[in-house]
């Protein structure tokens, strides 16, 4: 009876406690339960604490259900409400935003943008505040910042107005007047192009050129006895100056192709023909050196047939003139053939309006600053004209002809030197006249902007490629380490990281010795271009890396020396000077300055410098040779040692040198001798015709009658680079 009353009282108390479960957690509820039972019924505490929900299935189910409801409610109350899309802050963005502009639009610090771009494919270190962000990265920053993106129509649709200068439309035929032809003399090196031009000009240009080869484009206006004028461009024939020859054909009307009658068609001859065909320029053939006994003009004409240059003698339209630049033979005939072709072409130009032309060559003069040689193609150039070429502009201060005489005006087809450039334009740049200095600056700024846009596109392309590489590497890592235990994975990654750590000082020194940093300075833009084109053919980076640190036009400067010291490089100068102060500074800092006036000498020097960075090659030099006549073995201690009985056939055998065993043309063994005996006596040298017995430092080698023993010494010889620049 007492137990039933006790059970009823427990049920009543249980209902009271259940009402409190809505506001109390499980732990607090159990603590209160324990407290209530222990204070009211101390005698039955243990029983009351365990039995009501452990023994009664109904109570146990009710309590379990109550706990579940309370737990769900508490969890629901603990969850923070998700921010709705409407509550996100909208950020107005546009294409091509800079880091600074994006931070300002978000009303955040710039660091917020950098933090959002961390652990992405973009290179944070190279990211500046003015760097433009691609659409992908703008979206990434907005997303990580918990904001909503909104495209700005005004900014997105706004396109920068094109401010570039362009050529004028074609002139009215009524305004055109006849002009002199622009003739380019082309051909293989040393076929007499400059000597031929000397005869026409009655000058000695060839004698003044270093090494007797042309290394610039020379532009000259030649007046013939008949009163006709021809502008000649003398292009280099050397292999290194391919770009100059190509540039020469772009501004020319006629090409005089010079081929030596005793040498025939050569590599640069073929290249010159191709340049002329690409530019759709007619050719006049000048077969030079016809005064020589071995001259064969007909052979030259036949060789040219293979390159689609068909002379009039063979039914073609190419005029061929047999000349001798040395004696002056048929010089007038060549000039007349050129004038006749020019008349057929009906060359005309508009001498009015804004000037148009082309930069033939550019260089920096110490006293006059940047100077260009140009061909005027349209309009009349005068002092004070405002010109734009590439990303440079000029207000013409002075003009001069090929003889250095000042001129006031330059007409179409006239070569002229121009002084007044703010920066040095590149050879081949188009010259356009504009109305004012502000307009010139505007054009240059626009061209720089366009160049920057192109660079940004290339950079973004590289970034995207890098991102894909990282994703691919991450995917491969997951495949590689997916099934590996985390401890093993950590160890493998640690080991790989150790392999990628910076080199030790000794290793770094060895690595640096296989790199040649160079600084190239030239007298004119075209010369530097030619040297860089040759360096582009370098294909021996596996032997020694060729690192172009800096290049430019002008004499060697203090900055060049400091740069060479920083990179442990070599300075190469072509047709430039290095003053005494500069040379002393270079000597003090241990910097090599190498000056040359002939391009192939410079390239040879570069090859030698590259070779000096290579490890020496060990070569084998034979001293003597012996043939094995008999084999036997001797006992030394407890082991048998094989011995070969030999006769020296060539030279002599020296015990201290290296040896190799040859069998059927194959090397069986290389090493040293343990013993060398003549009869029964130890000896160090056995000469030709003498017999000897010898044993090797490797006991497992078995001798056979007829084998050859070669005695040789090893010598270290300097290695040579495998790079062949092509000349």
UniProtKB/Swiss-Prot annotation:
Residue span(s) of domain tr-type G: 178-348
Region (G5): 324-326
Keyword Nucleotide-binding attributed: yes
Function comment: One of the essential components for the initiation of protein synthesis. Protects formylmethionyl-tRNA from spontaneous hydrolysis and promotes its binding to the 30S ribosomal subunits. Also involved in the hydrolysis of GTP during the formation of the 70S ribosomal complex.
Oligomeric form and interacting partners: Monomer.
Region (G1): 187-194
Region (G4) location: 288-291
One Pfam family per UniProt: EF-G_D2
UniProt similarity note: Belongs to the TRAFAC class translation factor GTPase superfamily. Classic translation factor GTPase family. IF-2 subfamily.
Protein name: Translation initiation factor IF-2, mitochondrial
Residues covered by region (G2): 212-216
GO-annotated cellular components: cytoplasm; mitochondrial matrix; mitochondrion
Region ranges (G3): 234-237
